[in-house]
From Swiss-Prot:
Name this polypeptide is given: Late transcription elongation factor OPG087
Family, per entry: Belongs to the orthopoxvirus OPG087 family.
Keyword field: Early protein, Elongation factor, Protein biosynthesis
Keyword Lipid metabolism set for record: no
Purpose: Involved in postreplicative transcription elongation on intermediate and late genes.
InterPro entries named among the record's database cross-references: Chordopox_G2
Annotated organism of origin: Monkeypox virus
Taxonomic placement: Viruses, Varidnaviria, Bamfordvirae, Nucleocytoviricota, Pokkesviricetes
Length: 220
């Protein structure tokens, strides 16, 4: 594992979160491997980062012992950093009235309804006729489905990224600890790959490179 990846990972973490432990690690590694300020800013050319990078060389406390390997939690940390201060929302569909309440999962011709009021059920029966669609009492998988949310203000990142969501009010996309735990599950590798591949900007590009280094893939 290249020591530069370890430096760039911890520096990215410091630049995003101002984590002091990461600053100490970067400072110690740079002193040990004679990495200069100019070396670091070549990876972070945006001027907004430069005053923070200078702190690496002003830091007095250095680590006496350093691991030259990524920790077991590195993948989780990468996902956390990639989604740090993630801010997205879903615009409401004005075809859905404010009076509708409930959750509907539609996959193929199967429909699962939860916590729906009479207005939503009436709407569904008009739009999705029982002659064509099957209304099921069993849960329908959210992944790859159409999700209708009515009367909710938040939805998980996992639901947002794996389904097509329509809502009757503005819905914020929430990244929770549970969501990150689900994302690092090996069965969701493709979702992670898409997440890192879509990232733009200096830090996201670095995180993408380290993601492929940690998971053994090849950076596109």
């Amino acid at each position: 594992m290249p020591f530069r990846d370890l430096i760039l990972f911890n520096l990215s973490k410091f630049l995003l979160t101002e984590d002091e432990e990461s600053l100490e690690i970067v400072s110690s590694l740079c002193r040990g491997f004679e990495i200069s300020y100019d070396d670091l800013i070549s990876y972070f050319p945006d001027r907004k980062y430069h005053k923070y990078i200078s702190k690496v060389f002003e830091h007095v406390d250095l680590s006496e012992e350093l691991s030259m390997e990524f920790h077991d939690t590195t993948l989780r940390d990468l996902v956390y950093l990639r989604l740090y201060k993630y801010s997205k929302y879903i615009r409401p569909c004005y075809k859905l009235g404010d009076n509708l309440k409930g959750i509907v999962v539609i996959k193929d011709r199967n429909i699962y309804i939860r916590e729906a009021n009479d207005d939503l059920i009436e709407y569904l029966l008009k739009e999705y006729t029982p002659q064509i669609y099957t209304y099921s009492n069993e849960r329908v998988p959210i992944a790859g489905s159409k999700l209708i949310l009515c009367g909710f203000s938040q939805v998980t990142f996992m639901a947002y990224t794996t389904s097509h969501i329509t809502t009757n009010k503005k819905v914020d996309v929430l990244v929770s600890k549970k969501c990150i735990d689900e994302l690092v599950d090996p069965i969701n590798y493709q979702i992670l790959q898409n997440l890192f591949d879509k990232g733009s900007g200096t830090i996201n590009k670095i995180l993408r490179k380290i993601f492929y280094s940690v998971t053994g893939g090849q950076t596109p």
